[in-house]
């Protein structure tokens, strides 16, 4: 199977988000890469489902709370930018202050 670099990146994000979901389900607080992966995957899947950029920018802020992440992680992530594939093409989605 041949994958483009972009497809490899998407798979890596998806795999990291699965790991983050499992750790979160066990009650563990997420670290920086896990938090970014989980939010990014939620945005990518929402785009695939046909949600708008505005919806995803808003919903991206509800994926995690400060209680879900290790101390100081929320401050390390001021924005998350994700290139997501929508039904009408690829768009950049920016989630500002993703962990409230």
Swiss-Prot record:
Compartments reported by the entry: Cytoplasm
Key word Cytoplasm present: yes
Alphabetized HAMAP family for the sequence: Urease_gamma
Alphabetically ordered keywords of this record: Cytoplasm, Hydrolase
Gene3D superfamilies xref list: Urease, gamma-like subunit
Gene Ontology CC annotations of this record: cytoplasm
Pathway the protein contributes to: Nitrogen metabolism; urea degradation; CO(2) and NH(3) from urea (urease route): step 1/1
Annotated source species: Polaromonas naphthalenivorans (strain CJ2)
UniProt catalytic activity: urea + 2 H2O + H(+) = hydrogencarbonate + 2 NH4(+)
EC annotation from Swiss-Prot or TrEMBL: 3.5.1.5
Subunit structure: Heterotrimer of UreA (gamma), UreB (beta) and UreC (alpha) subunits. Three heterotrimers associate to form the active enzyme.
UniProt record similarity statement: Belongs to the urease gamma subunit family.
Top-level taxon of origin: Bacteria
Gene Ontology molecular function, alphabetical: nickel cation binding; urease activity
Record GO biological process: urea catabolic process
Main localization category: cytoplasm
EC category: hydrolase
Protein name: Urease subunit gamma
SUPFAM superfamilies: Urease, gamma-subunit
């Amino acid at each position: 199977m041949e994958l483009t670099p972009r497809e490899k990146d998407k798979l890596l994000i998806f795999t990291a988000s699965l790991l983050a979901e499992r750790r979160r389900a066990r009650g563990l607080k997420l670290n920086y890469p896990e938090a970014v992966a989980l939010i990014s995957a939620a945005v990518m899947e929402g785009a695939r489902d046909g949600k708008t950029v505005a919806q995803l920018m808003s919903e991206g802020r509800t994926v995690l709370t400060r209680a879900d992440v290790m101390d100081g992680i929320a401050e390390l992530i001021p924005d998350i930018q994700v290139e997501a594939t929508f039904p009408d093409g690829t768009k950049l989605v920016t989630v500002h202050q993703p962990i409230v």
